[in-house]
Amino acid sequence: MTKLPHSIGPLLVDEPDISRAWGKAVLHIIDHVGPEISPLILSVTGFEGNGVIPETPAIRVALDTLLSAKRMRSVEDVAFTIFPQRLWQVAQGDRAALFRYYRDAFPRYQAMNPRDNRRGLYFERLTSYGRGPCDGNQLEWILSQFEGREGVRRSMFQASVFDPDRDHVADAQLQFPCLQHVSFEPTKQGLVINAFYATQQLFVKAYGNYLGIAQLGAFMAHEMKTTLLRMNVIVGVAKFERLSKSDDALQPLIAACRANCAEQPSAAASVDLTAANAEIAA
């Protein structure tokens, strides 16, 4: 197959499920020369009011199968670094319990994988940043301000992961943090979550990243007594690495993406986006 020009250049993906959004980004890399997209802007809708994240099982299963074969972390494990969905289920809707469970368990998470987790985890940075109001629990601060009064400035609904004091280091490679920042935009139609990455590993981490961000957004929407409307992820450089694009083991995953990522009408999603943009502009 003749390759299209180099994949460096902006790519916008707008889909009603995270599997298809991730699949389209991967197919763009596969079908173009080079292993990177810069920048990648990925937007997902289709979220249900009960917090269920829309996925295409064929793509998710094919990816998890390949990750397992390559001895890499599963989608669920990567997502857990951003939002501990299992603990939220145990907490049964009590966010104070969720934060307490995570704080108590965090030393064990670090001990289970000291090489990758020695610098921290994303949810840990969001809830125990080390300084700031609410003992560094940025999510609790956002929610307490949202609940406490009307007319709160919109710039208040943001949380940082990157910390110059800890993360400006001269290491040749740094696994954490790639996610820099998240922000939340309540609208009349629902909550929009935005996430910003300097770099992102498309094969190894991106799908799990998107799932974790969506779960975080669904949690925040639940606590704001609304629903998750849209997830936007902005990536400076999305890289397809640690696996060659010519690896035969990729073929089942590529086939699943091609079978499920064909263009489909999305009038409803377009209407939602227009309405959300109008609300944000207002």
Briefly describe each language-model feature range.
Residues 1-282:
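Terminal, non-catalytic protein-protein interaction segments that mediate quaternary/complex assembly
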